[in-house]
Protein backbone atom coordinates (compact mmCIF):
# COMPACT_ATOMS: atom_id res chain seq x y z
CA UNK A 1 0.00 0.00 0.00
CA UNK A 2 2.98 2.23 0.36
CA UNK A 3 3.68 4.62 -2.49
CA UNK A 4 6.95 6.22 -3.39
CA UNK A 5 7.71 9.42 -5.19
CA UNK A 6 10.98 10.85 -6.35
CA UNK A 7 11.81 14.53 -6.04
CA UNK A 8 13.86 15.98 -8.86
CA UNK A 9 17.37 17.04 -7.96
CA UNK A 10 16.60 20.60 -8.96
CA UNK A 11 13.71 20.79 -6.49
CA UNK A 12 15.84 19.22 -3.76
CA UNK A 13 18.58 21.71 -4.50
CA UNK A 14 16.17 24.61 -4.22
CA UNK A 15 14.99 23.32 -0.84
CA UNK A 16 18.55 22.97 0.39
CA UNK A 17 19.48 26.42 -0.88
CA UNK A 18 16.44 27.92 0.76
CA UNK A 19 17.51 26.38 4.07
CA UNK A 20 21.16 27.54 3.80
CA UNK A 21 22.73 29.22 6.83
CA UNK A 22 23.84 32.80 6.14
CA UNK A 23 26.62 32.37 8.73
CA UNK A 24 28.26 29.49 6.88
CA UNK A 25 31.88 30.03 5.87
CA UNK A 26 32.75 30.71 2.25
CA UNK A 27 34.27 27.28 1.68
CA UNK A 28 31.11 25.51 2.80
CA UNK A 29 29.00 24.36 -0.15
CA UNK A 30 26.20 21.94 -0.92
CA UNK A 31 25.63 20.44 -4.33
CA UNK A 32 23.56 17.70 -5.94
CA UNK A 33 24.41 15.90 -9.13
CA UNK A 34 21.74 16.33 -11.81
CA UNK A 35 21.06 12.59 -11.76
CA UNK A 36 20.45 12.50 -8.00
CA UNK A 37 16.93 11.84 -6.78
CA UNK A 38 15.60 11.75 -3.23
CA UNK A 39 13.21 8.90 -2.40
CA UNK A 40 10.45 9.92 -0.02
CA UNK A 41 7.93 7.43 1.38
CA UNK A 42 4.35 8.52 0.95
CA UNK A 43 1.60 6.71 2.85
CA UNK A 44 -2.18 6.74 2.65
CA UNK A 45 -3.69 9.12 5.19
CA UNK A 46 -5.78 6.32 6.75
CA UNK A 47 -5.34 2.79 8.07
CA UNK A 48 -7.99 0.16 8.75
CA UNK A 49 -7.82 -2.14 11.77
CA UNK A 50 -10.19 -5.09 12.05
CA UNK A 51 -10.97 -6.85 15.33
CA UNK A 52 -12.61 -10.20 16.06
CA UNK A 53 -13.49 -11.71 19.43
CA UNK A 54 -12.72 -14.93 21.26
CA UNK A 55 -11.18 -17.78 19.27
CA UNK A 56 -12.24 -20.85 21.27
CA UNK A 57 -11.81 -24.59 20.86
CA UNK A 58 -14.28 -26.90 22.55
CA UNK A 59 -14.13 -30.68 22.59
CA UNK A 60 -16.30 -31.17 19.50
CA UNK A 61 -14.10 -28.79 17.50
CA UNK A 62 -11.04 -30.82 18.46
CA UNK A 63 -12.81 -34.08 17.62
CA UNK A 64 -13.77 -32.73 14.21
CA UNK A 65 -10.24 -31.52 13.51
CA UNK A 66 -8.98 -35.04 14.22
CA UNK A 67 -11.68 -36.62 12.03
CA UNK A 68 -10.66 -34.42 9.10
CA UNK A 69 -6.95 -34.81 9.77
CA UNK A 70 -4.37 -36.41 7.54
CA UNK A 71 -0.92 -37.85 8.13
CA UNK A 72 0.61 -34.51 7.17
CA UNK A 73 -1.99 -32.46 9.05
CA UNK A 74 -3.44 -34.58 11.88
CA UNK A 75 -5.47 -31.70 13.35
CA UNK A 76 -7.23 -30.00 10.48
CA UNK A 77 -8.61 -26.48 10.93
CA UNK A 78 -7.94 -25.38 7.35
CA UNK A 79 -11.50 -24.34 6.47
CA UNK A 80 -12.54 -22.83 9.79
CA UNK A 81 -11.68 -19.20 9.07
CA UNK A 82 -11.30 -18.88 5.31
CA UNK A 83 -14.66 -17.19 4.68
CA UNK A 84 -13.56 -14.11 6.63
CA UNK A 85 -10.22 -13.88 4.81
CA UNK A 86 -11.47 -11.21 2.35
CA UNK A 87 -12.26 -8.90 5.29
CA UNK A 88 -8.89 -9.60 6.90
CA UNK A 89 -6.97 -8.99 3.69
CA UNK A 90 -8.91 -5.79 3.05
CA UNK A 91 -7.72 -4.36 6.37
CA UNK A 92 -4.22 -3.12 7.10
CA UNK A 93 -3.95 -4.97 10.43
CA UNK A 94 -6.11 -7.77 11.88
CA UNK A 95 -6.48 -8.74 15.54
CA UNK A 96 -7.96 -11.79 17.31
CA UNK A 97 -8.12 -13.07 20.90
CA UNK A 98 -6.43 -16.49 21.14
CA UNK A 99 -8.38 -17.82 24.12
CA UNK A 100 -6.42 -20.99 24.69
CA UNK A 101 -2.85 -22.20 25.15
CA UNK A 102 -1.03 -24.26 22.54
CA UNK A 103 -0.17 -26.98 25.03
CA UNK A 104 1.78 -29.41 22.88
CA UNK A 105 1.88 -33.18 23.14
CA UNK A 106 -1.35 -35.07 22.46
CA UNK A 107 -3.28 -34.15 25.59
CA UNK A 108 -5.45 -31.52 23.92
CA UNK A 109 -8.78 -30.56 25.43
CA UNK A 110 -11.75 -28.24 25.42
CA UNK A 111 -13.61 -26.64 28.32
CA UNK A 112 -12.78 -26.09 31.13
CA UNK A 113 -8.98 -26.42 30.70
CA UNK A 114 -8.27 -25.60 27.08
CA UNK A 115 -5.32 -26.73 24.99
CA UNK A 116 -5.16 -26.69 21.20
CA UNK A 117 -2.76 -28.03 18.56
CA UNK A 118 -0.36 -25.64 16.87
CA UNK A 119 -2.30 -25.99 13.61
CA UNK A 120 -5.18 -24.06 15.19
CA UNK A 121 -3.03 -20.94 15.46
CA UNK A 122 -1.54 -21.57 12.04
CA UNK A 123 -5.03 -21.65 10.49
CA UNK A 124 -5.75 -18.27 12.08
CA UNK A 125 -2.55 -16.87 10.65
CA UNK A 126 -3.24 -18.35 7.22
CA UNK A 127 -6.66 -16.71 7.25
CA UNK A 128 -4.95 -13.35 7.63
CA UNK A 129 -4.63 -12.46 11.32
CA UNK A 130 -1.63 -10.32 12.24
CA UNK A 131 -1.88 -9.87 16.03
CA UNK A 132 -2.82 -12.52 18.60
CA UNK A 133 -3.99 -11.45 22.06
CA UNK A 134 -2.90 -13.92 24.74
CA UNK A 135 -3.91 -12.29 28.03
CA UNK A 136 -7.22 -13.90 28.97
CA UNK A 137 -8.68 -16.10 31.67
CA UNK A 138 -7.54 -19.31 29.94
CA UNK A 139 -3.91 -18.40 29.22
CA UNK A 140 -2.69 -20.42 32.24
CA UNK A 141 -4.89 -23.47 31.63
CA UNK A 142 -1.67 -25.43 31.04
CA UNK A 143 0.20 -23.38 33.61
CA UNK A 144 3.55 -21.68 33.01
CA UNK A 145 4.78 -24.37 30.65
CA UNK A 146 1.77 -24.04 28.38
CA UNK A 147 1.95 -20.25 28.43
CA UNK A 148 5.61 -20.27 27.43
CA UNK A 149 5.08 -22.92 24.78
CA UNK A 150 2.30 -20.81 23.25
CA UNK A 151 4.73 -17.92 22.94
CA UNK A 152 7.37 -20.21 21.42
CA UNK A 153 4.90 -21.36 18.76
CA UNK A 154 3.72 -17.84 17.95
CA UNK A 155 7.33 -16.66 17.71
CA UNK A 156 8.14 -19.53 15.34
CA UNK A 157 5.19 -18.42 13.19
CA UNK A 158 6.59 -14.86 13.19
CA UNK A 159 3.20 -13.48 14.16
CA UNK A 160 2.71 -10.53 16.50
CA UNK A 161 1.39 -11.27 20.00
CA UNK A 162 0.89 -9.39 23.26
CA UNK A 163 -0.50 -9.97 26.74
CA UNK A 164 1.62 -12.78 28.22
CA UNK A 165 5.37 -13.10 28.62
CA UNK A 166 7.91 -15.71 29.63
CA UNK A 167 8.93 -13.61 32.62
CA UNK A 168 8.77 -10.07 33.97
CA UNK A 169 12.02 -9.14 32.27
CA UNK A 170 10.53 -10.02 28.89
CA UNK A 171 7.43 -7.94 29.59
CA UNK A 172 9.62 -4.97 30.46
CA UNK A 173 11.49 -5.47 27.20
CA UNK A 174 8.49 -6.03 24.90
CA UNK A 175 6.11 -3.41 26.31
CA UNK A 176 5.50 -0.92 24.75
CA UNK A 177 4.43 -2.79 21.63
CA UNK A 178 4.14 -0.30 18.77
CA UNK A 179 3.30 -1.23 15.19
CA UNK A 180 3.80 1.13 12.27
CA UNK A 181 0.75 0.82 10.02
CA UNK A 182 0.66 2.97 6.89
CA UNK A 183 3.20 5.27 8.49
CA UNK A 184 1.18 5.65 11.71
CA UNK A 185 2.66 4.41 14.98
CA UNK A 186 -0.03 2.42 16.79
CA UNK A 187 0.47 1.19 20.35
CA UNK A 188 -1.35 -1.96 21.50
CA UNK A 189 -2.03 -3.12 25.08
CA UNK A 190 -3.81 -6.27 26.33
CA UNK A 191 -4.98 -7.13 29.87
CA UNK A 192 -7.17 -9.70 31.63
CA UNK A 193 -9.29 -9.54 34.79
CA UNK A 194 -7.92 -12.92 35.95
CA UNK A 195 -6.94 -16.48 35.07
CA UNK A 196 -9.66 -18.60 36.70
CA UNK A 197 -7.77 -18.77 39.98
CA UNK A 198 -4.68 -20.31 38.39
CA UNK A 199 -1.49 -18.48 39.26
CA UNK A 200 1.87 -18.61 37.56
CA UNK A 201 4.19 -20.80 39.63
CA UNK A 202 7.44 -20.46 37.69
CA UNK A 203 7.76 -16.80 36.87
CA UNK A 204 5.52 -16.55 33.80
CA UNK A 205 4.06 -13.07 33.39
CA UNK A 206 0.41 -12.27 32.65
CA UNK A 207 -0.79 -8.72 32.02
CA UNK A 208 -3.57 -8.44 34.59
CA UNK A 209 -5.92 -5.47 34.88
CA UNK A 210 -4.12 -3.25 37.38
CA UNK A 211 -4.74 0.47 37.06
CA UNK A 212 -1.31 1.49 38.25
CA UNK A 213 0.37 -0.83 35.76
CA UNK A 214 -1.99 0.19 32.97
CA UNK A 215 -1.26 3.86 33.61
CA UNK A 216 2.47 3.14 33.60
CA UNK A 217 2.32 1.23 30.31
CA UNK A 218 0.11 3.81 28.61
CA UNK A 219 2.62 6.50 29.53
CA UNK A 220 5.52 4.34 28.36
CA UNK A 221 3.75 3.64 25.07
CA UNK A 222 3.23 7.35 24.39
CA UNK A 223 6.79 8.14 25.40
CA UNK A 224 8.07 5.46 23.01
CA UNK A 225 6.41 7.25 20.10
CA UNK A 226 2.91 5.82 19.76
CA UNK A 227 0.64 8.30 18.00
CA UNK A 228 -2.54 6.44 18.90
CA UNK A 229 -3.17 3.71 21.49
CA UNK A 230 -5.45 0.66 21.38
CA UNK A 231 -6.23 -1.22 24.63
CA UNK A 232 -7.89 -4.64 24.60
CA UNK A 233 -9.16 -5.71 28.04
CA UNK A 234 -10.57 -9.14 28.87
CA UNK A 235 -13.36 -8.10 31.24
CA UNK A 236 -17.06 -8.11 32.02
CA UNK A 237 -19.58 -10.80 32.94
CA UNK A 238 -20.18 -13.84 30.76
CA UNK A 239 -23.45 -14.06 28.79
CA UNK A 240 -24.59 -10.54 29.76
CA UNK A 241 -25.50 -8.33 26.78
CA UNK A 242 -24.71 -4.99 28.41
CA UNK A 243 -21.55 -3.67 29.99
CA UNK A 244 -21.43 -3.16 33.74
CA UNK A 245 -20.22 -0.28 35.90
CA UNK A 246 -16.80 -1.87 36.35
CA UNK A 247 -16.27 -1.92 32.58
CA UNK A 248 -17.48 1.65 32.18
CA UNK A 249 -15.20 2.81 34.98
CA UNK A 250 -12.13 1.11 33.53
CA UNK A 251 -12.94 2.39 30.05
CA UNK A 252 -13.20 5.96 31.35
CA UNK A 253 -9.94 5.53 33.25
CA UNK A 254 -8.09 4.30 30.17
CA UNK A 255 -9.50 7.05 27.95
CA UNK A 256 -8.55 9.68 30.51
CA UNK A 257 -5.03 8.27 30.56
CA UNK A 258 -4.75 8.56 26.79
CA UNK A 259 -6.17 5.40 25.20
CA UNK A 260 -8.00 6.16 21.96
CA UNK A 261 -9.60 2.80 21.11
CA UNK A 262 -10.83 0.11 23.52
CA UNK A 263 -11.88 -3.33 22.25
CA UNK A 264 -13.15 -5.71 24.93
CA UNK A 265 -13.72 -9.43 25.13
CA UNK A 266 -14.66 -12.30 27.50
CA UNK A 267 -18.48 -12.23 27.88
CA UNK A 268 -18.92 -14.62 24.87
CA UNK A 269 -21.79 -12.42 23.70
CA UNK A 270 -21.69 -9.05 22.02
CA UNK A 271 -22.01 -5.85 24.01
CA UNK A 272 -22.51 -2.25 22.82
CA UNK A 273 -20.06 -0.12 20.83
CA UNK A 274 -19.87 3.60 21.47
CA UNK A 275 -17.99 6.59 20.13
CA UNK A 276 -17.26 8.89 23.06
CA UNK A 277 -16.57 12.60 22.49
CA UNK A 278 -14.73 14.60 25.13
CA UNK A 279 -16.96 17.63 25.83
CA UNK A 280 -13.95 19.88 26.46
CA UNK A 281 -11.35 18.84 23.89
CA UNK A 282 -13.64 17.31 21.26
CA UNK A 283 -11.38 14.25 21.15
CA UNK A 284 -13.24 11.18 19.89
CA UNK A 285 -12.57 7.71 21.28
CA UNK A 286 -14.10 4.29 20.60
CA UNK A 287 -15.25 1.78 23.20
CA UNK A 288 -16.36 -1.72 22.16
CA UNK A 289 -17.36 -3.59 25.30
CA UNK A 290 -17.42 -7.09 23.78
CA UNK A 291 -17.25 -8.65 20.32
CA UNK A 292 -18.54 -12.01 21.54
CA UNK A 293 -17.22 -15.32 20.23
CA UNK A 294 -15.25 -15.61 17.03
CA UNK A 295 -15.52 -19.39 16.83
CA UNK A 296 -16.73 -21.90 19.43
CA UNK A 297 -19.13 -24.77 20.03
CA UNK A 298 -21.22 -22.82 22.51
CA UNK A 299 -24.98 -23.16 22.19
CA UNK A 300 -26.31 -20.78 24.85
CA UNK A 301 -28.39 -17.88 23.60
CA UNK A 302 -26.36 -15.28 21.73
CA UNK A 303 -23.10 -17.29 21.87
CA UNK A 304 -23.24 -18.97 18.47
CA UNK A 305 -21.68 -15.99 16.74
CA UNK A 306 -20.26 -12.56 17.29
CA UNK A 307 -19.40 -9.26 15.70
CA UNK A 308 -16.38 -7.80 13.99
CA UNK A 309 -15.50 -4.13 14.10
CA UNK A 310 -13.62 -2.24 11.39
CA UNK A 311 -11.84 0.81 12.76
CA UNK A 312 -10.37 3.55 10.60
CA UNK A 313 -7.64 5.78 11.95
CA UNK A 314 -6.29 8.80 10.10
CA UNK A 315 -3.52 11.33 10.05
CA UNK A 316 -4.86 14.87 10.04
CA UNK A 317 -3.37 16.58 6.95
CA UNK A 318 -3.26 19.93 8.75
CA UNK A 319 -1.89 19.02 12.18
CA UNK A 320 -0.21 15.68 11.45
CA UNK A 321 -2.03 14.19 14.44
CA UNK A 322 -3.14 10.55 14.24
CA UNK A 323 -6.66 10.01 15.52
CA UNK A 324 -9.70 7.76 15.43
CA UNK A 325 -11.94 8.50 12.42
CA UNK A 326 -14.83 6.01 12.47
CA UNK A 327 -15.94 2.44 13.08
CA UNK A 328 -18.56 0.05 11.75
CA UNK A 329 -19.58 -3.49 12.61
CA UNK A 330 -20.71 -6.66 10.89
CA UNK A 331 -21.92 -10.04 12.14
CA UNK A 332 -21.14 -13.72 11.64
CA UNK A 333 -22.05 -17.13 13.03
CA UNK A 334 -20.27 -20.43 13.64
CA UNK A 335 -21.45 -23.15 11.28
CA UNK A 336 -21.40 -26.60 12.88
CA UNK A 337 -20.48 -29.69 10.84
CA UNK A 338 -23.41 -30.95 8.80
CA UNK A 339 -21.97 -33.85 6.87
CA UNK A 340 -18.81 -35.71 5.84
CA UNK A 341 -15.89 -33.40 5.14
CA UNK A 342 -17.45 -30.37 6.83
CA UNK A 343 -15.95 -28.56 9.78
CA UNK A 344 -16.80 -25.82 12.24
CA UNK A 345 -16.62 -22.66 10.17
CA UNK A 346 -17.07 -18.93 10.69
CA UNK A 347 -19.71 -17.69 8.23
CA UNK A 348 -19.96 -13.89 7.90
CA UNK A 349 -23.06 -12.02 6.80
CA UNK A 350 -21.78 -11.50 3.26
CA UNK A 351 -21.38 -15.29 2.84
CA UNK A 352 -24.54 -16.34 4.62
CA UNK A 353 -25.82 -18.17 1.54
CA UNK A 354 -23.11 -20.77 2.27
CA UNK A 355 -24.67 -21.64 5.62
CA UNK A 356 -26.67 -24.91 5.48
CA UNK A 357 -30.41 -24.34 5.34
CA UNK A 358 -30.94 -26.24 8.58
CA UNK A 359 -28.78 -23.67 10.41
CA UNK A 360 -30.36 -20.53 8.97
CA UNK A 361 -32.63 -20.28 12.00
CA UNK A 362 -29.59 -19.96 14.27
CA UNK A 363 -28.28 -17.20 12.04
CA UNK A 364 -31.58 -15.31 12.04
CA UNK A 365 -31.83 -15.47 15.83
CA UNK A 366 -28.23 -14.33 16.33
CA UNK A 367 -28.24 -11.59 13.73
CA UNK A 368 -31.59 -10.17 14.85
CA UNK A 369 -30.49 -10.15 18.50
CA UNK A 370 -27.28 -8.31 17.68
CA UNK A 371 -29.10 -5.84 15.45
CA UNK A 372 -31.70 -5.14 18.15
CA UNK A 373 -29.04 -4.59 20.81
CA UNK A 374 -26.90 -2.36 18.63
CA UNK A 375 -29.84 -0.34 17.31
CA UNK A 376 -30.74 0.47 20.91
CA UNK A 377 -27.34 1.05 22.50
CA UNK A 378 -24.65 1.73 19.90
CA UNK A 379 -23.47 5.32 19.59
CA UNK A 380 -22.15 6.34 16.16
CA UNK A 381 -21.09 2.79 15.21
CA UNK A 382 -23.36 1.71 12.34
CA UNK A 383 -23.62 -1.59 10.54
CA UNK A 384 -21.20 -1.91 7.67
CA UNK A 385 -22.47 -1.76 4.11
CA UNK A 386 -19.11 -2.86 2.75
CA UNK A 387 -19.20 -5.77 0.33
CA UNK A 388 -16.27 -8.17 0.14
CA UNK A 389 -15.35 -10.40 -2.73
CA UNK A 390 -16.57 -13.88 -1.88
CA UNK A 391 -14.00 -16.42 -0.71
CA UNK A 392 -13.12 -19.06 -3.27
CA UNK A 393 -14.12 -22.14 -1.25
CA UNK A 394 -17.68 -23.40 -0.98
Where do the protein language model's features map onto the residues?
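C-terminal motif of bacterial Sec signal peptides marking the signal peptidase cleavage site
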Residues: 15-18
